[in-house]
Structure formats: C-alpha cells, structure tokens
C-alpha cells in the first residue's frame, strides 16, 4: 500500500468523525415540519460532505499504483465496504427526503435516520480497520 493511499484513508477517517457527530446530535421530531426540514437540510449538507469523501476514495481506485494495493486483500475489501456505505448513505437520504417532503414527517422515519447514522459508523469502522492493520 502506498503511503499516499494510507494518508488519504487517514484523512477520510478524520473528516468523517465530525459528520458522524453532527448526525448523532440531530434531534428527530415526527411532529414538526420545521424541525424535519432543518434535519433534512443538515443531512443534505452531510451528503455533500460524504460525496467529497467518496471522491477522495475514488481517487485511490483510480490511481495507477492501486494495482500494487490489490495484493493487500483486506485493504481492498475494506475500501469497497467504505464506498458501499457512503453510497448507501447518499441513496437512502434521497429516498428519505422525498418521502418526508411528499408525506410529511412521520414517526416511523426515525429508523431511516438511524440507518443513515449506522452507515457512516460502519464506514468509519472499515477505515479504522485499514489503519490498524497497517500500523
């Protein structure tokens, strides 16, 4: 694994932490349009941040030296999982946003918010696995 790839993984992990903290700090209220709209805006900001992190992740896959990293199966598998988690987060947000805007806030959407948070935490775990396996 190249030092550049490892440094990029470290940066992605560090940049993901405040996003997770922000999402975990958001209050879910199924009875308030204002609070639901605010929550959706905060999540939309997180989606944009995740897209930026995903672009950084993709740069590892696009790097010509990535072929050297393919020898490290655990590294590649964990990167794939992070990519999947980021994608699942973004896609699920789009679904949730359209449901809330069409139907209004509902109490059963709380599981959707929990799912979003869980995807980012799972991505962070895979990034941490890469970093602990290497160091």
Q: What are these language model-derived features?
A:
Residues 4-135:
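Long, low-complexity or tandemly repetitive, helically biased scaffold regions used
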């Amino acid at each position: 694994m190249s030092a550049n790839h490892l440094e990029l993984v470290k940066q992605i992990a560090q940049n993901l932490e405040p996003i997770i903290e922000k999402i975990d700090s958001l209050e879910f209220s199924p009875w308030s349009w204002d609070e639901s709209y605010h929550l959706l805006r905060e999540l939309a900001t997180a989606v944009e941040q995740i897209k930026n992190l995903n672009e950084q992740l993709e740069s590892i896959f696009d790097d010509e030296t990535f072929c050297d990293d393919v020898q490290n199966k655990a590294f590649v598998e964990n990167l794939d999982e992070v990519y999947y988690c980021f994608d699942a987060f973004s896609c699920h947000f789009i679904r949730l946003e359209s449901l809330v805007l069409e139907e209004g806030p509902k109490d059963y959407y709380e599981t959707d918010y929990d799912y979003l948070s869980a995807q980012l935490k799972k991505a962070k775990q895979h990034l941490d696995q890469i970093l602990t396996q290497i160091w």
